[in-house]
A protein has these predicted regions:
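N-terminal glycine-rich phosphate-binding loop for ADP-containing cofactors
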Residues: 1-209
Length: 209
């Protein structure tokens, strides 16, 4: 299978799983981008900033195509877009190309540019908030990514709950893709790392855990 197909299949499923876990543990956009960025070896743009840069319409198109084309995928329901994403698309809040998405640039009273974040419950923008979690504080001195995963997944707070839910479901999903989309684990890792900018692919991450 083409590498872009493998990357999208796992990467988009993983992104939508992040939103699923976010709802489960009542986290917000700022918190998710803090939890899913460089601390877990993913780009600084993390989840929602990445969506704004790429364009939500692209994500919607890929997810809808995967949902339609994979009737036998046991994880298919994850490709069914959540209401929040559908509402963003209906509003044409697609990200940078339309001037607003999960984030929006605005001028404050002093004429300075500030970044506002979308509250997915009220659909109103509010000033970007600093996300803090005890689990993240404990990893500040850990440079090795695989060592960091162990600490993150053992977290006793909401961040730990989020990581366990998100990663364990991702590991289950990718293990079921062998041999369906690839005979070799490394091909899935390479496709996701290359396409989505992850430092470690899902199987390498699992190894680390």
């Amino acid at each position: 299978l083409p590498i872009s197909f493998i990357g999208n299949r796992v990467g988009v499923w993983g992104l939508l799983k992040v939103i699923d876990s976010m709802r489960k543990y009542d986290l917000n956009v700022d918190e998710i981008d803090k939890l899913t960025g460089p601390v877990i070896g993913r780009p600084k743009s993390a989840t929602f900033r990445t969506s704004d840069v790429v364009g939500l319409d692209t994500l919607v198109k890929v997810a809808n195509n995967l949902y339609a084309g994979l009737p036998n995928d046991e994880g298919r329901e994850m490709f069914k877009l959540p209401d929040t994403v559908n509402k963003l698309e209906q509003n044409k809040w697609l990200g940078d190309k339309t001037g607003q998405g999960f984030y929006k640039k605005s001028k404050n009273a002093k004429g300075e540019t500030e970044i506002l974040t979308l509250d997915l419950k009220t659909f109103e923008y509010q000033p970007k908030a600093k996300a803090k979690f005890a689990t993240l504080e404990t990893t500040k001195t850990i440079d090795n990514l695989k060592d960091r995963y162990k600490v993150l997944l053992a977290g006793k707070d909401k961040a730990g709950d989020f990581y366990r839910d998100m990663f364990f479901d991702l590991f289950k999903y990718v293990s079921n893709r062998i041999p369906e989309i690839s005979d070799e684990l490394f091909r899935i890792d390479d496709a996701v790392s290359g396409g989505f900018g992850w430092d470690l692919g899902p199987f390498e991450t699992w190894d680390g855990v």
